[in-house]
Amino acid sequence: FKNGTFQLLNYDEGETDMGDGTTWRNLLKYGRELDEGYYMMVTGTRLASGAVLSNSTFFTIEPGKTTTVDLVMRESKDQVQVIGNFNSEATYRPVDSTEQRSILQTCGRGYFVVAVLGVGQEPTNHALRDIAALGNDFEQWGRKMVFLFPSEKQYKKFNADEFKGLPSTITYGIDVDDSIRKEIVQAMNLNNSILPVFIIADTFNRVVFVSQGYTIGLGEQLMKVVHGL
C-alpha cells in the first residue's frame, strides 16, 4: 500500500520447467523478503464456468519481524472447479491408423474424457464396468472419450466385449512413448506407476476432474462433473 493505493508486485515468469518462474514453490514455500508496510494478498480459484472465487487477506510487514499469513484458496461445493492443465493438442495414435493425431482433432471443441488404461488390471476393469453401466448417460452427453493403451501389445489383449454397454463415443488409441500419461502425471502430481488415469478436460486446456487407480463409482463421479459443466 503506497501513496493511497495498492500497487501490484511483479515477478519474472521465467522458465517453470527449469525450476524458475512464478510457482508456489518459488514464491511462497520458503517465504519472501518484503519491504515494511501494509499489504493485500489476493488468491483465486477458477471455476469451469469462468467465474473466480477470490479471497483477500490484509497484513502488515514490520521491520525485523517474520509475518506468517495463511494462504486461503476458496472452494465451491456446488460448482466444478479447474484443478489443472492438459494440452489438448497432445498426440496419440488411433488403433485404426498409422498416423498420430491430437486429442483436439479427435474431440473437437469443448469437454472430453481422456484415460490411460492398464489392460487386465482390476482397477481398470472396475472403472470400465462403472462406465459401461452408465453408457446411455455418456451417449446422451455426446462428448468424445479417448481411451489409451500404453502399447500396441496391451491393446491387443483388450476385449471390449467383456464390458457390455461402453458408449460408442469412445475412441481407442496408443499412448506413444507414454507421452500423454507423463503429461497428466506431471501436471496433476500423480504417481507414474498407477493405472488407470482418467481426466475430464476441455480444449482451453483446463482439467476439471482427475482420478487414478482403484475408484468406487467412477462412472457416477464422471457424470456428476459432466452435469455440473
Write out the residue ranges for each language-model feature.
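Structural microenvironment flanking redox-active thiols in thiol-disulfide oxidoreductases
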Residues: 120-167, 178-185
